[in-house]
Amino acid sequence: MRAVCVFVLACVAVSGAPGVRGQDGPAEEELFQRAEDLLLRSILTQMEEQNSENDQPEWMEKRQHPGKRQHPGKREEDLEPEVEMERWRRQHPGKRAPLDLGMLEDPTALSELSKRQHPGKRYLMLLHKRQHPGRRELQEADGDSAELEKRQHPGKRRCEGWADAGCGLLELLDTSGAPEKRQHPGRRAELEDELPGLE
């Protein structure tokens, strides 16, 4: 574009030079001067408009974050799946919406997901609820009973089969009228160390 401007200026300068055609009247000279000024102004305004139109979007694109600083009406409603996947991968793992889990219908599962969890224990709450060891219900008699007995307090194990009634009677006879005192775990260890010395 600048080459065209220089070429036009050279043509006007050569055609308006007094030595080329001889002495023209002052009216023609004034006419050529006005034409030259108008031509230069129009070319300069066109160049400024093109530069301002081209520079502004590049400047705005450099400044903008892909999901930010856009007018709400100009945001793309239908994002491509690749763009959506990229946005999902860039999110913090704790903030990701677990859309692929089919357990969101359960309100307790949804509330458990909103809590912060250790990374190795994520989503375990969805599979089973935590319960007090003494109040757990057996879901399967085979596999869960061994695990349940391992995790319960040794004195609170459940009896299986026909011995349930006998265990209930033994528990009633075992408990005295006074409630059992609980001790701090550290105190219990001290007492155990002292017992062998007493014998």
Swiss-Prot record:
Signal sequence bounds: 1-22
Source taxon at top rank: Eukaryota
Ranges annotated as biased composition (Basic and acidic residues): 147-160, 179-190
Entry GO terms, CC: extracellular region; secretory granule
Gene Ontology biological process terms, A to Z: eating behavior; histamine metabolic process; hormone-mediated signaling pathway; negative regulation of glutamate secretion; positive regulation of gamma-aminobutyric acid secretion; positive regulation of insulin secretion
Listed Pfam families: TRH
Residues found modified as Proline amide: P66, P72, P93, P119, P133, P154, P185
Pyrrolidone carboxylic acid: residues carrying this PTM: Q64, Q70, Q91, Q117, Q131, Q152, Q183
Locations listed in the record: Secreted
Keyword field: Amidation, Cleavage on pair of basic residues, Hormone, Pyrrolidone carboxylic acid, Repeat, Secreted, Signal
Region (Disordered): 48-90, 129-160, 175-199
Gene Ontology MF annotations: thyrotropin-releasing hormone activity
Primary role: Functions as a regulator of the biosynthesis of TSH in the anterior pituitary gland and as a neurotransmitter/ neuromodulator in the central and peripheral nervous systems.
Family: Belongs to the TRH family.
UniProt protein name: Pro-thyrotropin-releasing hormone
Gene (UniProt): trh
